[in-house]
Amino acid sequence: MEGDCLSCMKYLMFVFNFFIFLGGACLLAIGIWVMVDPTGFREIVAANPLLLTGAYILLAMGGLLFLLGFLGCCGAVRENKCLLLFFFLFILIIFLAELSAAILAFIFRENLTREFFTKELTKHYQGNNDTDVFSATWNSVMITFGCCGVNGPEDFKFASVFRLLTLDSEEVPEACCRREPQSRDGVLLSREECLLGRSLFLNKQGCYTVILNTFETYVYLAGALAIGVLAIELFAMIFAMCLFRGIQ
């Protein structure tokens, strides 16, 4: 009876580790996709160093889970106590790290508010300065999504650095200008009229709504996946310790 129980635990351990292996592969794939996504999600993430760090953490955690899932499968099949103990300790560390990251994300969620983005834009935006990472990122976001500022074109009335650099000669940056719908090269409808703030020639929608909608799509997916991975890790640790204690 004890042998049957041990055998059952062994196969359950293998199954749960296989799911960890798949979960790690999914996290790794999502992390890679976020970093190379051609639709502009990378630019949105790059606008906030905290989020960019999160993307790299996603890549690292995905790769680590991928390897540990493989390690756990080997430990279960070979019934190696050393591998099982090594697996348990590392899964425990990862589990605690993921839990801590989730708590920190909840605590610092105010960094994603409309007020935060507006404050950063009006304080640091420099217009068409490609050497400034912050400004270049915002320009890329506004061009990609056809939006202007955080709330709309009026944000640039309070962008102190932008106003100083343009000597108040431009109401909005060129990135806010509307482009020819059929143009592959992004030809502007009228650069002069746009920079003067003529509403027919600039994008009036703020980028915050676009960013929020984009994040809602990915955050729910990532959140559901993270909960699933945490649950699998918890069961895997239980099975690993039970199998470890059952092996003579």
From Swiss-Prot:
Presence of the UniProt keyword Transmembrane helix in the record: yes
Keywords noted in UniProt: Glycoprotein, Membrane, Transmembrane, Transmembrane helix
Cellular component annotations (GO), alphabetically ordered: plasma membrane
Entry membrane topology: Multi-pass membrane protein
Glycosylation site residues: 111, 129
Gene Ontology terms: biological process: calcium-ion regulated exocytosis; establishment of localization in cell; hemostasis; inflammatory response; regulation of sprouting angiogenesis
Annotated Gene3D superfamilies: Tetraspanin
Chief localization: membrane
Tissue spec. comment: Highly expressed in primary endothelial cells. Expressed in the embryo heart. Weakly expressed the embryo skeletal muscle.
Protein name, per record: Tetraspanin-18
Organism this protein belongs to: Homo sapiens (Human)
The encoding gene: TSPAN18
